[in-house]
């Protein structure tokens, strides 16, 4: 994949008037009260965004989405002061990741993630569940890109608390061959989440994941 000059932005608009409220775009960090710039926002965003309410007041204040470069983004839009709204990089799981090179790491996110408020022994977190796959080529059986199903633990759950974590593939525990096939307890480090490799040639995720009572379903 290559960087995109279109589609690499997030817009918040007034539903009644269509007026711009706030947007996040690629740039050097200048911006204004209604424009936030992030230098890493270089890939298009083809899906809708997952929305969350971090403080339970009935208003959306957290957005999460993936892009076609394998990045996962978090937008904090808490409160009426848009100059405090921000976009942060939660994870880099594709061609922009540390040590990534070639088509094998050209992972793309075409579908909205599932955002699930959760808790473990380390405290509260938002589970960001997402899967990679090149949707424009669903019948590709070449298997040249290694796709995954992911669950990322975003522990910055307080309103406006997002930071550029930039989690990498290796930060997520690999559950492909040592957790799902065994009845014994999983010993993989799941502090930041997990990754499940899709091992069949051309295998990819082609829909938004669905989480029900602790179980995740991928298509």
Predicted regions and their residues:
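Beta-propeller fold recognition
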Residues: 1-219
């Amino acid at each position: 994949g290559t960087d995109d000059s279109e589609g690499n932005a997030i817009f918040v608009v007034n539903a009644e008037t269509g007026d711009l409220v706030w947007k996040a775009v690629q740039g050097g960090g200048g911006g204004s009260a209604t424009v936030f710039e992030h230098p890493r926002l270089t890939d298009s965003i083809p899906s809708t965004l997952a929305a969350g309410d971090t403080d339970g007041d009935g208003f959306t204040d957290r957005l999460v989405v993936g892009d076609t470069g394998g990045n996962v983004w978090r937008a904090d839009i808490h409160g009426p002061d848009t100059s405090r709204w921000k976009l942060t990089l939660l994870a880099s799981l594709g061609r922009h990741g540390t040590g990534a090179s070639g088509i094998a790491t050209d992972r793309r996110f075409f579908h909205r993630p599932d955002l699930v408020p959760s808790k473990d022994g380390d405290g509260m977190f938002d589970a960001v569940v997402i899967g990679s796959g090149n949707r424009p080529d669903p019948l590709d059986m070449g298997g040249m890109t290694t796709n995954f199903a992911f669950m990322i633990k975003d522990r910055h759950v307080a309103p406006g608390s997002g930071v550029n974590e930039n989690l990498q593939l290796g930060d997520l525990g690999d559950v492909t061959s040592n957790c799902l096939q065994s009845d014994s307890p999983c010993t993989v480090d799941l502090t930041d989440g997990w990754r499940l490799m899709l091992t069949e040639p051309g295998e990819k995720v082609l829909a938004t994941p669905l989480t029900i009572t602790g179980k995740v379903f991928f298509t």
